[in-house]
From Swiss-Prot:
InterPro entries documented for this protein: GPCR_Rhodpsn, GPCR_Rhodpsn_7TM, Mu_opioid_rcpt, Opioid_rcpt
Originating gene: OPRM1
Protein name: Mu-type opioid receptor
Glycosylation: residue positions: 9, 12, 33, 40, 48
Phosphothreonine sites (modified residues): 372, 396
Disordered: annotated span: 364-386
Residues with PTM Phosphotyrosine: 168
PTM entry text: Phosphorylated. Differentially phosphorylated in basal and agonist-induced conditions. Agonist-mediated phosphorylation modulates receptor internalization. Phosphorylated by GRK2 in a agonist-dependent manner. Phosphorylation at Tyr-168 requires receptor activation, is dependent on non-receptor protein tyrosine kinase Src and results in a decrease in agonist efficacy by reducing G-protein coupling efficiency. Phosphorylated on tyrosine residues; the phosphorylation is involved in agonist-induced G-protein-independent receptor down-regulation.
Sequence similarity: Belongs to the G-protein coupled receptor 1 family.
CDD domains referenced in this protein's UniProt entry, alphabetically: 7tmA_Mu_opioid_R
Length: 400
């Protein structure tokens, strides 16, 4: 979701917001580099405005749609960055900190939070790129930021697909779930998801580079000749393998789960277990639905742009920015969903934000027990010393 996909024929103009020259079509990115891939988008402030039927209104002075869009995007990116980093790191902390949170489902949630935290950490770089109209951070960071975008997109959807299959096994095959749904297996599957995402992320990292154009620097993707073929091939492969196929698998899994939940009143023989099973299934479904809602517009937009030519208007530019920002917004929504939909997460978040005396005592006792396990010889020595002191006091005590 980087902001560098731009037409090569654009020149500089006076940017009403940054008071400096602005280079071509920098979509403030999301699908990274779907803004990179979608190189036909032009900056409404660029010289291409003369190609829009003379409608110079795309680059008016202060108060223009471009300035309003820029301010809105910067404000949204700031909120997403702060909420996303804090929320996702908090999710990872409570999963690592509390033993009761180390379930198979939460291990997958940890992976999702890690991917979201990584992508929100790139937003400051993309904001600077958008405001300055150039990429000042060098080629290495260009490669890192673009590849993180693709890694986040693919790892997130693969993890959600895994969570849906995991829920399907838990609901429809509870006996098999006992052997399969373990934290250890969940960790292995998480690693496999990152390896699978590398099929997209690593090629993108190698293709990402910086280019000098019209006095500015673009962080963009380069394709072998013929570039249009490889560019469209990447778009289509990402759309099919990192969106359509996972969404189909998720849909099938939840369709089968709904049929199972409707046909069976008692899944596990325990009302409490059934309640927890349905609650977790509902939470995963909501997280998946929100992801699809946030990411569908940008995927559809990019595919449409690959197939047909869309006239460049203010509405087209604003809608592009909106689709990109919507994809990023998903990265900060998941922690909020966990807090509202899962009692365990809600309780852990509350304990972290508002620690009570009982929680502090419990943490201290847990730490003492951990130290005792880590240093048994020291603990035994202390016990023996205390026992000897008690005996000495008993022996030296005056008789009544």
């Amino acid at each position: 979701m980087d902001s560098s996909a731009v037409p090569t024929n654009a020149s500089n103009c006076t940017d009403a917001l940054a008071h400096s020259s602005c280079s071509p079509a920098r979509s403030p990115g999301s699908w990274v580099n779907l803004s990179h891939l979608d190189g036909n988008l032009s900056d409404p402030c660029g010289p291409n405005r003369t190609d829009l039927g003379g409608r110079d209104s795309l680059c008016p002075p202060t108060g223009s749609p471009s300035m309003i869009t820029a301010i809105t995007i910067m404000a949204l990116y700031s909120i997403v960055c702060v909420v996303g980093l804090f929320g996702n790191f908090l999710v990872m902390y409570v999963i690592v900190r509390y033993t009761k949170m180390k379930t198979a489902t939460n291990i997958y949630i940890f992976n999702l939070a890690l991917a979201d935290a990584l992508v929100t950490s790139t937003l400051p770089f993309q904001s600077v790129n958008y405001l300055m109209g150039t990429w000042p951070f060098g080629t290495i960071l260009c490669k890192i930021v673009i590849s993180i975008d693709y890694y986040n997109m693919s790892t997130s959807i693969f993890t959600l697909c895994t969570m849906s299959v995991d829920r399907y096994i838990a609901v429809c095959h509870p006996v098999k779930a006992l052997d399969f749904r373990t934290p250890r297996n969940a960790k292995i599957i998480n690693v496999c998801n990152w390896i699978l995402s590398s099929a997209i992320g690593l090629p993108v990292m190698f293709m990402a580079t910086t280019k000098y154009r019209q006095g500015s620097i673009d962080c963009t993707l380069t394709f072998s000749h013929p570039s249009w073929y490889w560019e469209n091939l990447l778009k289509i492969c990402v759309f099919i393998f990192a969106f359509i196929m996972p969404v189909l698998i998720i849909t099938v899994c939840y369709g089968l789960m709904i049929l199972r939940l409707k046909s069976v009143r008692m899944l596990s023989g325990s009302k409490e277990k059934d309640r927890n099973l349905r609650r977790i299934t509902r939470m995963v479904l909501v997280v998946v639905a929100v992801f699809i809602i946030c990411w569908t517009p940008i995927h559809i937009y990019v595919i449409i742009k690959a197939l047909v030519t869309i006239p460049e208007t203010t509405f087209q530019t604003v809608s592009w920015h909106f689709c990109i920002a919507l994809g990023y917004t998903n990265s900060c929504l998941n922690p909020v969903l966990y807090a509202f939909l899962d009692e365990d997460f809600k309780r852990c978040f509350r304990e972290f934000c508002i620690p009570t005396s009982s929680n502090i005592e419990q943490q201290n006792s847990t730490r003492i027990r951990q130290n005792t396990r880590d240093h048994p010889s020291t603990a035994n020595t202390v016990d023996r010393t205390n026992h000897q002191l008690e005996n000495l006091e008993a022996e030296t005590a005056p008789l009544p």
